[in-house]
Amino acid sequence: MPKRTDISNILLIGSGPIVIGQACEFDYSGTQSCKTLKSLGYRVILINSNPATVMTDPEFSHQTYIQPITPENIATIIEKEKIDAILPTMGGQTALNAVMQMHQKGMLEGVELLGAKIEAIKKGEDRQAFKEAMLKIGMDLPKGRYAYTELEALEAINEIGFPAIIRASFTLAGGGSGVAYNIEEFQELAKNALDASPINEILIEESLLGWKEYEMEVIRDSKDNCIIVCCIENIDPMGVHTGDSITIAPSLTLTDKEYQRMRDASFAILREIGVDTGGSNVQFAIHPETLRMVVIEMNPRVSRSSALASKATGFPIAKVATMLAVGFSLDEIQNDITNTPASFEPSLDYIVVKIPRFAFEKFAGVSSTLGTSMKSIGEVMAIGGNFLEALQKALCSLENNWLGFESLSKDLEAIKKEIRRPNPKRLLYIADAFRLGVCVDEVFELCQIDRWFLSQIQKLVEVEESINSSVLTDAKKLRGLKNLGFSDARIAAKIKENENLEVSPFEVELARSNLQIVPNFEEVDTCAAEFLSLTPYLYSTYAPNPLPPIENKQEKKEKKILIIGSGPNRIGQGIEFDYCCVHASLALKDLNIKSVMFNCNPETVSTDYDTSDTLYFEPIHFECVKSIIQRERVDGIIVHFGGQTPLKLAKDLAKMQAPIIGTPFKVIDIAEDREKFSLFLKELDIKQPKNGMAKSVDEAYSIANVIGFPIIVRPSYVLGGQHMQILENIEELRHYLESVTHALEISPKNPLLIDKFLEKAVELDVDAICDKKEVYIAGILQHIEEAGIHSGDSACFIPSTLSPEILDEIERVSAKIALHLGVVGLLNIQFAVHQNSLYLIEVNPRASRTVPFLSKALGVPLAKVATRVMVLEDLKEALKFYDKKNIVGYSKGVYKPKMPHFVALKEAVFPFNKLYGSDLILGPEMKSTGEVMGIARSLGLAFFKAQTACFNPIKNKGLIFVSIKDKDKEEACVLMKRLVQLGFELCATEGTHKALEKAGVKSLKVLKISEGRPNIMDLMMNGEISMAINTSDHKSQDDAKLIRASVLKNHVSYFTTLSTIEVLLLALEESSKEDELLALQDYLK
């Protein structure tokens, strides 16, 4: 049937901020869904609190509510926008949970759910209802029991036995789940799982550890047509969350008989659950010996795996699911890549490998052991002609300095221990075991990874050990290595290792070129080349191909520009950079220039098949970039939008005289080189904090003594503030140097950067655009947290509350830097205002993570403006094209936007609740995974909204726990007095209690954990604490860390700096005032 005409206003619920388990994949699916609904003529209304997403750009929906995703807000939008139907299946667990809460409160009267009805959501998400539905249709399930209390859980474990898996209903990314091997572990896991489930329901089931795990991406329409889009196999056996597992498509160790059983079961499950207009993900486990197949769970929505399946096959699951939700059937929908009906099941003639990206180095105390609760921050995908080619390409894509199967250890006992323990480096330890002569069967007993995968790694190791310089003149051998996925850099490294002969990657490339060994570029076309592909979505392979290679036909010379993406999501480089790359592609379209996108992240909008004119899915390594440049003969390359990843390639690109457009490499080099940049600032007479570069440990002590404490130290060439610390005295410096030199050598090549730390300074971020002649100061973002907390973790807002004199100076200095550097495009400058003086902290001649937020706040697409400037080098023209009404200031070559009449605030979102053992205290090393935006008529209300959106709601009354470090106590007492005046009660441990008492602020003294019972943890567990204020630091004792862990565990809202408390007080003082719920389009009128 054609599209429905009985509905017109459709509300799409987004997934909110990037968190572990819900990342860019929902921006990809949401953007695709918004575009589809709009193209079909529906009025689209969106709610999503994440400003870094493409889907929240005003042009993708008619009304865009960047507001907290709460039942109350959704109900207000339903009434205000006269919503006919809600599409909740594109917003992950957040959207499903929101509509379930609304249903339970009776808030969905007269509104239809599209894609999945309430009954289907309940059956799919409620583990008891799912079990009953599966038993009804004869599906085998793991033996299990449900529990709603800790007592029922204990009864269940007596029946199930150990080891047992505990799973919580209606949670994201395995939240609250785990494997218990004994009663003590079980009791803690059961309590946590009951707390994590919004309906206090948990499932205790028999352990399936060691079983093989598979996922089926299924689509069903209203005519009961069903297709399997993709079958994904987990290399890691059951026991590791599928989001943390290395996965492959198509499945490689599944017999056709098993596949058909799984396919039939998937269709039967969708029919029983009631998913009749959309996509779902169904997970199975198969015993490797008995072949018993059990159903694990299903998601009645588009999921993380759906995004992977879409990118792996080229089949646009989110678009098709959206069209099915509004009435179409599969045979009525056209596959955009081949122009064949969407009812054709995709067929793959290549192998896809996904590897997760972790950030354990950022969180001391967090175990890197993987289990049923997800821990990864991002992922990469690689495509190859065979398994090993795809696997090695994926390893190279992770950007953690692995060139392939790097050797990690020669200690066999240590290696065996690491193979037993699921962890991000397990495959590399398996390779090390094979290097030491361990057989496949012995490795299998340690890890339960299928023997076929293990034998492939063993084969790779055998080949590696035979690599020597003779391959450089032997075409057959060299082609064979490239066919197995060996990068030029890895071949060079193995020649050095095996022969002690220095060979550079360039020499390997030259040898390849002389022997005419170049990659073939093949298409992802959903049909194994059976039909002609109309949209170029390409990957490289050295695998032999019986078909002729795809030619890069160019009827006439069209201008083309290559955009180098940002690679895997990680802390410090997230969705904000992908947003900028997407905008670059859209801006090139406006210029009638062909865009070529290059990335390896399957979650993102940039790797959607219709974002750019040509898409290359490849590791972001110089070897791959060079081959694409040579193939495409591009007229320009953009390296400034993907964060540090493409910027690191700029030097090699400049050497080969590649056409980098925008800010040239020599400018990037000045900004990135500490000594060159300090000289540059001296020439311009711009103040920066006292600093020095220590090239040895002794030099570090002498520089610190000259500068004076406190100091901030950081090694060179690290991302996201890794190993960066604030040190108060010589003893702390000594301890730091002793610990950091274990991880990093301080030398002339790797100096330690030492700066004077400006205490109590106000930090600012400035984003600007320059064309070498004029400058556009897009925004001055004021940080709430003081200097010393990484800018990516600090809340910031616009317009600034600083004096006009300081703001004028910031604009003047920013313009001076941009023009004298010779920036063409975006740049980001960080300043600190200390004792009324302006200091420059750093300059990044690239897009920053604040660009998407600022673009939303101003209504100006900054990345598009910058792209146009990079191509045309005409700032005035670019602003006129994209910002017809907003420029108000022009003086001395400086443009300024009209400041908003509202306050827009960006707040960071952290993964602490997913990473057990992490500490919520912030510092110079970045820890946040995502962000939210609060928009309101005042700073206090914007902050109030942002805290609600980032799961840290501000309470209006109750008991506040206060723990203040000594140096903050005097200032804190003044603020605490205001909290008491607002009606709050305070409680504190002895030191803070005495300080409050001395200042005349009433508080209840509570015991520390080590002082007896009942203590502060008991109060938290009993739900008596409404909020916590803790300004301790990482140097505080274990007792304080346990208290902070209790804050997280018991979902207590918390605040960790005095500057945040000042804004919290504003929020509390204004929270009783009504603030109308407005769409972004209304704010920008």
UniProtKB/Swiss-Prot annotation:
Mg(2+) 1 binds at Q283, E297. Residues 1-399 are annotated as: Carboxyphosphate synthetic domain. Mn(2+) 1 binds at Q283, E297. Its EC number is 6.3.4.16, 6.3.5.5. Pathway: Amino-acid biosynthesis; L-arginine biosynthesis; carbamoyl phosphate from bicarbonate: step 1/1; Pyrimidine metabolism; UMP biosynthesis via de novo pathway; (S)-dihydroorotate from bicarbonate: step 1/3. It catalyses: hydrogencarbonate + L-glutamine + 2 ATP + H2O = carbamoyl phosphate + L-glutamate + 2 ADP + phosphate + 2 H(+). Disulfide bonds: none annotated. Mn(2+) 3 binds at Q830, E842. Mn(2+) 4 binds at E842, N844. Belongs to the CarB family. Large subunit of the glutamine-dependent carbamoyl phosphate synthetase (CPSase). CPSase catalyzes the formation of carbamoyl phosphate from the ammonia moiety of glutamine, carbonate, and phosphate donated by ATP, constituting the first step of 2 biosynthetic pathways, one leading to arginine and/or urea and the other to pyrimidine nucleotides. This is Carbamoyl phosphate synthase large chain. It comes from Helicobacter pylori (strain ATCC 700392 / 26695) (Campylobacter pylori). The lineage of its organism: Bacteria, Pseudomonadati, Campylobacterota, Epsilonproteobacteria, Campylobacterales. The gene is carB.
